[in-house]
Amino acid sequence: MHFQPTRNTPLAWIDRIVFTTACAVALVVGEPSVPAFAQAQWKMATEYPQSNISGVGLETFGKTVSSNTHGSLTTLNAFDNEMKISSREMLRAAQDHRIDGGDAFAGPLESSDPIFGLSSLPFMVQSLDTAKEVAARARPLYERALSTRGLKLLYITIWPSTGIWSDQPLKNPEDLRALSVRTYDGNSAEVMRAVGATAEYLPLNEAIAKLKEHKLNAILTSGDGGVARQLWDDLHHFTPINYAIPISIAFVRQDDFDALPKEAQDEVEAAAAETEKSQFELLANRTAENYKRMRSNGVSIDEPAPPAVIAALKKAGSSPIAAWRAKVSADAIAILDWANQHQ
């Protein structure tokens, strides 16, 4: 079979021009490090404000992953409980496809798996170095707990240490009995009740509403949580009891991650690692910056916390710690024992 050569018709010349131009553009522009794929957007949520450390993490991750993938993957972040999804409900919300993922404070997730209560056990961790090591040792356990629910761990955020915001100073254990306090998980509610306080576990936005209605006079949270919510409008004392150095966990649905091409998956992993690193670096100055803002807004930071107050709270913390040990794996208990030896 013989083929006739192409005639130099006007249409043929146009084809050649288009082809030549396309080749030139490809050579000039070059190929992106991540091949283009169908645009994807992950809807992510947190119950905390954008300026809170949880919100900062979502912002950092979103910007980094968008940059890494040349805008092919972006995040749509909902802050300050905009979607009415508390940390306790967040795993289920992702499974139900209301969100793709988010950043959840870990303590309330204990209702899904007890391992998530590790970082907020009372007085278990007393330094950032210990908190970082505990998070690293527990990471495979967090990953496993999420994986069984079709979810993937992205990064861990370590929070500033927990204290008590109150309308009156806490000078002795008797002052604890006068508190109507919001706590951030079931264990902390049990501890506060054991010292005589009226305690209720609530998402922070619900607690602030009750604070405005004078149904609460204290909130258990970090300086970071309080600054982001401007708790100084109602509570003028902060006692840094160092109750815990807790974490929040950022995650996404595994099927969303699996739908990405391998190159994009690698960039997501890189963005998550970079976010976790930058979140930890924030802690170096975060507490000092928070305290400066608190003092400038009339908050008395009553440090050091009275030893008798700490002793009463530590004694009350023994029961929830024992209960937690009874329902977790040997691997989890080993992490707790290690932390106790490195106070």
Regions found by a protein language model. Name each.
Residues 19-20, 25-35:
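C-terminal segment of classical bacterial N-terminal signal peptides
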Residues 19, 37-130, 139-343:
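N-terminal secretory/targeting leader peptides
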Residues 136:
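An acidic, glycine-rich surface segment that forms the CoA-thioester-binding/catalytic face
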Residues 1-14:
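N-terminal secretory signal peptides that target proteins for export/translocation
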